[in-house]
Amino acid sequence: MNSRKKSREVALQVLFQKIFSEDSTAEELFSAFQGSFDLDPKTSERAHTLTSSVLKHENEIFAILESKSKNWRVDRMATIDLIILKLAIFELCFDKDDDTPPKMCISDYVDVAKKYSSADSKKFINGILDEVWKSSEK
């Protein structure tokens, strides 16, 4: 698995754990998780950046998600799908340091959904991220 994909999966797992450890900071959770993964420094730094940036921009990301999830209430989405979408929306709309092409970013997160979520999630996530990408190009 390449560094970019691994950092996304680590960030996903840390953000998922954050839901159940509300009193813990992202840094505390990331430090606890870091020992569970064999991460090189670049991957570790990227995963930490993704985690903290999604939390920092959570309100803006949520607003974008709500506007692009037609016929879907965000509060009814599966938790893991919601986290995958938040990570991807951060990368598509806010991450100016990453030069990953948008289509590749979307494809990578659809692959994450295939691995961590239900069979139907990949289509749902792909559809929302495609809408986000199209609107961010304008």
Predicted regions located by residue number:
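N-terminal interaction/assembly modules
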Residues: 1-122, 126-138
